[in-house]
Every structure is written in structure tokens, then in C-alpha cells.
Amino acid sequence: MTTDALYVGIDVAKESLDVASNPAGLKLSLPNDPAGWKTLLDHLAKHSVLLVVLEATGGYERPLVAELLGTGFNVVVANPRQVRDFARGVGQLAKTDRIDAQILAKFACMVQPRPRQQPSQQTATLAEMVTRRRQLNGLLTMESNRLPMARNAKVRRSIQKVVEVLEHQIGALDTLIRDNIESDDGLRRMDEIVQSVKGVGPGTSAMLLSHLPELGQLNRQQIAALAGLAPWDVRSGKWAGQSRIWGGRKEVRNMLYMAALTAIRCNPAIRTFYLRLGSQGKQFKVAITACMRKMLVILNTLVRNNCLWSPQPIKNA
């Protein structure tokens, strides 16, 4: 191994990988397949790699990320929008696979984003199951919406058959998700804690366990930012705009939205908080986002303290 410390950027496409480093020195173009991953790992093993950054590319990056994490590298899967804004900020307007790899390496060096943890096999499997359930649920919604519009009996029957198949598959996945959680002591306890909060059901719990494994390990500001629920101020001189949320994990945020809608009906603490915001003239979108953030902070505190929900105020929540 050489003693030079490198930040590595990898641009991932469906069939190819472009690799660059900062400081410059490492330039590779490889196939995005097991042989290409092995070649990449062999090259990286010759250097002292501080951080590897890739962009989220619709799932094409996931097998490589698993290989890198399994080998012990610090890995970040960056938001493409954040990386593109960074590129514009450093004056790089051109965009090719090779340039993207160089920008990712420079982003890793200058921004040094927080590396992701290596998920356990149980958590990785759970994440895949939860993602698949979300996909099937989306298909079910589309087919269900088509049914009232279908006038031909044969077409209606066709849609009904597809709906039945999707409902069966979703039910089977629910069983697999439950079995996966029950088979792991850590996941089972975390699930028990999360579902102890009124408004949080099995679906939201499974999403949090699989797609927000940092729950309980970060402070309130960090966990809110990770889910895209941290308000960002917009100010310039004496002018102050409305604070907005931005970025974060969309799937987690969507599930928390549904959980918050339920909580303002059945969870006295969240309902009181929501009504207070309404009495202050807050719009629904602002109030429900605040409820989502409050629920997430409460869940984060409960998991960190390894305790179940109590109507009494929670310290640091």
C-alpha cells in the first residue's frame, strides 16, 4: 500500500464505472460488474483511501456500495442535486462521466460528508423488502384508480385480477418483513419502541428501521436533516424569507407524513402540538411538517434511550 491519502469519486452508470481521485493520480474506466468491482478494489487497496463518494443512480450503485462497505471503506452515496450544485460552485459546468468522477472526488475532499454505516445483513434484506412493498403498493394504487374508469366488463375483470395478485404479493411481503424483524433482537426491540408511539404503524416502523438505521445515533438536528425535515433559513440583509425544508430521504419523509396525519387524530401530544400551531395561524403544510419533525425527534430520543413511549415529556425531545 502506498502512503498517499486519497479521496475517491466514482461515477456509476448501468454498465460502467469511471473512477477519479483527489489528489489526482487514480483514473479508471471499468465495467459495472463483479469483475470490474474486483479490479477497483484491487486498485483501491494499493492506496490509503480516506473516503469514497458515489451518486445515487437509481440503484445501479447499490451492489458496488455493498462491496466497498464490506471491504471496510468509508462510503458516501451523495444526493445528485447537492453534487451538481457543488460542481457549479467550483465553476465546473461541463458534464461527462469522467468529469463527474473528478467532481465527486473533489466533493469528497472539500465537503467530507458523513460516511454511511455498514448495514447488517438483516437490515439490508429488510430495506430491499420494504422497497419492493412500496413499489407494489404504487402499482396497486394505479390499478385501483383505473378500475372505476373501465367500462368494458372484460377490462374490469383484468384489472381486478391484477389487483388481487398485487394484494396477495403485498400480504406475503408483509409476512416476510415481520419475520425478518422478529428474527433479529435489535430490530425487534427497535420496532417495539417505534410502534409504541401512537400514530406509528408497522409500515412506518419498517421504513424507519430499514431506511433510517441512524435513528437513535444522531442528535435532533442531524436526524431531522437526514430525513429532510430540518428548516433552513432564507435571509439576506434585512430581508427574511420563509424557512423551508430541503433534501433528505424522501421515502422516510413520505411515511412520516402519513404517520403524522394519524397522530394528530389519536396521539394527544401530537394533536395538542398541531392545534397550538393552528391557533398561531400556521398553515397546514407548516404545521404537519412540524409534527413530522417532532415525531421523528421523539422516536430518535426513545431509540437512543431504549425506552417505550410515555405521555410524559421526553428529555431532549
Residue spans for each PLM region:
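A short amphipathic alpha-helix within small helical-bundle interaction modules
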Residues: 136, 166, 194-195, 218, ...
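Phosphate- and other anionic-substrate recognition elements at nucleic-acid/protein interfaces
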Residues: 1-168, 265, 286
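Basic, amphipathic alpha-helical segments enriched in Lys/Arg and hydrophobic/aromatic residues
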Residues: 279-317
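Helix-hairpin-helix/helix-loop-helix acidic hairpins
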Residues: 147-203, 212, 267, 271
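Short linear capping/connector segments at secondary-structure termini
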Residues: 119-124, 153, 158, 190-192, ...
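Phosphate-backbone recognition surface of nucleic-acid-processing proteins
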Residues: 202, 206-280, 284, 311, ...
